[in-house]
């Protein structure tokens, strides 16, 4: 019999239900989590034995959305879900980041977490639900997991923090922050903000962590009732004699190597020391394990770097704790791009371009939460040559997608609104060198490239990566961390913003005990670094250029009456296609009658505007037009009088005398003056050549006949 065990609780404005014991009973653990009709099914499978020689922790997190959750069938050719979307990849990373540091060092058994969205309420984003589910499933599994964790989304509306805002509330919020942590510590923060202060951001982190304690309490209650026995796993005992011998052989040499400021030279020297130490030890005792020697050397390397920083000595590259590496800022480096910049900070460098397009270039996203159009695209590329390596080049990996999204968050708050700047904008960051904080270099480069392209951003933005080294008695916050400091430190803390406030904040914390005081120090130190970088950037370009690039399309906007839209489009799009070909422009019409004409040539745009005005002009009864015969029928002739409008000249209105045969008087393509006699309620136009002939010269010039309108 199926005996589900259920835990239900109120979480802000939502009711959360945790259920286990019903499904996937062969998995190590499985939980169905629902939050107001958004339901995510999360499973955990852990292998009891580690693979021989496994040198890292093989944790895999897969988050997948099923279209049936929203009552839809996939729109792909095969009518089934395919490769993960960018959103699914980002949510997988969001789940992975806070749970990974909670597994003990030395645990290398394979673990897979799969979160499947099976029902979705468009007002409740599944990402928080999936994070809660992953935490609950891991806590139930018996794996050596030092959780559970809680997760919360925090908004900022009307100067108040809002717990887990709905999708509608989030559209009005100045903040979208996700925070995850254990009972006593914040582990992960991911956010974007509309220029909020350091205190407001820190307050949101603390608020979210306080509120999510109810999640942790309820997961613990579920584990008490349904949890599996804890795995009897213990880390392998450290060979103290070997560790002492390695310290004696390598400590002073590693300390000297970490005074070499150039990255490649330092890496080469460290590799030599490790190789020589390992060879010497194996020569002394062939029974020693090379992998164990490697692990102990890595631990020694970490201790050498950390202890120097904690003693207040200069960092690896000789800087003090709050110093920024040397900056080199250049704009307009690529002649034919719409905007470009080369941003260099020490050994980290980004070549960033900005490209302007029309609304047609925007990305249409058919997501589980509904369809949306994205007119600001940010793509981050990390080729292997940037770190002096060879490797595969192809589709973006999870890391590239995640870094691109973080950089996009850093710039999004200063981008102009669509009605003020009707362009689709694509920013691409090519990381050409990397030694720490390439995503924040991308933010700086993007700001520069956008200004170089003439995009009227509200303010310049810059990003900085902070680090932390902490022991029981002391802590040091580092500005502008190197790759080694990120790897060997206790926290990776990235902040982007303008002079006015923060636009993006990302935190990944590897240890417990990060207090509010430490986060406050890091945020304040990051502000000083950000302002320093902005000062250097402003020397290269102080604001957006006065005009967009000569190579970018210029978009001209006009307004037409809604009931004239069909005239401009024409039957089956015939009129708008003809206009596009005739004028050499791109024309887009919105439902409210807004017409956007894009052209690289101003004269072509003016011609297109004139033609649209002709098509949409009202026909005046009694006015004489110069028209062109487009069709001849037994009872008269149809004459185009401009702008795709056509009227009928009845056979009785061709001449003063009786007309037996229309073709005796009119030929196809013949230009004739016509007078408008009537426009009926259905828009049909009655014309007369006979009455026009009694007048003097035609009052309206002929225009080329356009395809028939609907």
UniProtKB/Swiss-Prot annotation:
E.C. no: 2.7.7.8
Keywords, in A-Z order: Cytoplasm, Magnesium, Metal-binding, Nucleotidyltransferase, RNA-binding, Transferase
Gene Ontology MF terms in the entry: 3'-5'-RNA exonuclease activity; magnesium ion binding; polyribonucleotide nucleotidyltransferase activity; RNA binding
Binding residues annotated for Mg(2+), in chain numbering: 486, 492
Domain S1 motif: 622-690
GO cellular component: cytosol
InterPro entries recorded: ExoRNase_PH_dom1 (IPR001247), ExoRNase_PH_dom2 (IPR015847), ExoRNase_PH_dom2_sf (IPR036345), KH_dom (IPR004087), KH_dom_type_1 (IPR004088), KH_dom_type_1_sf (IPR036612), NA-bd_OB-fold (IPR012340), PNPase (IPR012162)
Disulfide-linked positions: none
Catalytic activity: RNA(n+1) + phosphate = RNA(n) + a ribonucleoside 5'-diphosphate
Residue ranges, annotated region (Disordered): 690-710
Family the entry assigns: Belongs to the polyribonucleotide nucleotidyltransferase family.
Quaternary assembly: Component of the RNA degradosome, which is a multiprotein complex involved in RNA processing and mRNA degradation.
Name the UniProt record assigns to this protein: Polyribonucleotide nucleotidyltransferase
């Amino acid at each position: 019999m199926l005996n589900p065990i259920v835990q239900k609780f109120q979480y802000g404005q939502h009711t959360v239900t945790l259920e286990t014991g019903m499904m996937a009973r062969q998995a190590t653990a499985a939980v169905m989590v629902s939050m107001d009709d958004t339901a995510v099914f999360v499973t955990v499978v852990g292998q009891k034995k580690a693979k021989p020689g496994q040198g890292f922790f093989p944790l895999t997190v897969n988050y997948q959305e099923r279209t049936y959750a929203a009552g839809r069938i996939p729109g792909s050719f095969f009518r089934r879900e395919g490769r993960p979307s960018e959103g699914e990849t980002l949510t997988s990373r969001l789940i992975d980041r806070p749970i990974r540091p909670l597994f003990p060092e030395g645990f290398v058994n394979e673990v897979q977490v799969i979160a499947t969205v099976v029902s979705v309420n468009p007002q409740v984003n599944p990402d928080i639900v999936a994070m809660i589910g992953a935490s609950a499933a891991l806590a139930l599994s018996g794996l050596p997991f030092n959780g559970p964790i809680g997760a919360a989304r925090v908004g900022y509306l009307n100067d108040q923090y809002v717990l887990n805002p709905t999708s509608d509330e989030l559209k009005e919020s100045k903040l979208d922050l996700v925070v995850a942590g254990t009972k006593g510590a914040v582990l992960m923060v991911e956010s974007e903000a509309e220029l909020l202060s350091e205190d407001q951001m820190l307050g949101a982190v603390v608020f979210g962590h306080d509120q999510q304690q109810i999640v942790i309490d309820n997961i613990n209650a579920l584990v008490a009732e349904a949890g599996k026995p804890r795995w009897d796993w213990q880390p392998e005992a450290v060979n103290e004699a070997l560790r002492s011998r390695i310290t004696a052989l390598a400590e002073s040499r590693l300390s000297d190597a970490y005074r070499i400021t150039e990255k490649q030279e330092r890496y080469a020297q460290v590799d030599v020391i490790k190789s020589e130490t390992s060879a010497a030890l194996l020569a002394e005792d062939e029974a020693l394990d090379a992998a164990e020697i490697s692990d102990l050397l890595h631990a020694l390397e970490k201790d050498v770097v950390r202890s120097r920083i904690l003693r207040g000595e200069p960092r690896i590259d000789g800087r003090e704790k709050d110093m920024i590496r040397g900056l080199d800022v250049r704009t307009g480096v690529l002649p034919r791009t719409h905007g470009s910049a080369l941003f260099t900070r020490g050994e980290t460098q980004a070549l960033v371009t900005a490209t302007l397009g029309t609304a047609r270039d925007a990305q249409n996203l058919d997501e589980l939460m509904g369809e949306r159009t994205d007119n600001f695209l940010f793509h981050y590329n990390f080729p292997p040559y940037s770190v002096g390596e060879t490797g595969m080049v192809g589709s973006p990996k999870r890391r590239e997608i995640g870094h691109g999204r973080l950089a996009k968050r850093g710039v999004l708050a200063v981008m102009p609104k669509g009605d003020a700047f009707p362009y689709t904008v694509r920013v691409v960051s090519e990381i050409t060198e990397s030694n720490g904080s390439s995503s924040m270099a991308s933010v700086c480069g993007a700001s520069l490239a956008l200004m170089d392209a003439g995009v009227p951003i509200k303010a310049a933005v810059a990003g900085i990566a902070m680090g932390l080294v902490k022991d029981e008695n002391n802590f040091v916050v580092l500005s502008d961390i190197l790759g080694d400091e990120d790897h060997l430190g206790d926290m990776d803390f990235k902040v982007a913003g303008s002079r006015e406030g923060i636009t993006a904040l990302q935190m990944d914390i590897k240890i417990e005990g990060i207090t509010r005081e430490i986060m406050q120090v890091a945020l304040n130190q990051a502000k000083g670094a950000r302002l320093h970088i902005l000062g250097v950037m402003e020397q290269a370009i102080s604001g957006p250029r006065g005009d967009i690039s000569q190579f970018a399309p210029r978009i001209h906007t006009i307004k037409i009456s809604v009931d004239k839209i069909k005239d401009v489009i024409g039957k089956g799009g015939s009129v708008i296609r003809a206009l596009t070909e005739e004028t050499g422009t791109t024309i887009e019409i919105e439902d409210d009658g807004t017409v956007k004409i894009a052209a690289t040539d101003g004269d072509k745009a003016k011609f297109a505007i004139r033609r649209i005005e002709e098509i949409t002009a009202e026909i005046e009864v009694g006015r004489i037009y110069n028209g062109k015969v487009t069709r001849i029928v037994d009872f008269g002739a149809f004459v185009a009088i401009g702008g795709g409008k056509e009227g009928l000249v009845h056979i009785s209105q061709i001449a003063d005398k009786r007309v037996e045969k229309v073709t005796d008087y009119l030929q196809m393509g013949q230009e004739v003056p016509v007078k408008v006699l009537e426009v009926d309620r259905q828009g049909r136009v009655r014309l007369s050549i006979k009455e026009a002939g009694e007048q003097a010269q035609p009052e309206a010039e002929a225009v080329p006949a356009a395809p028939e309108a609907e």
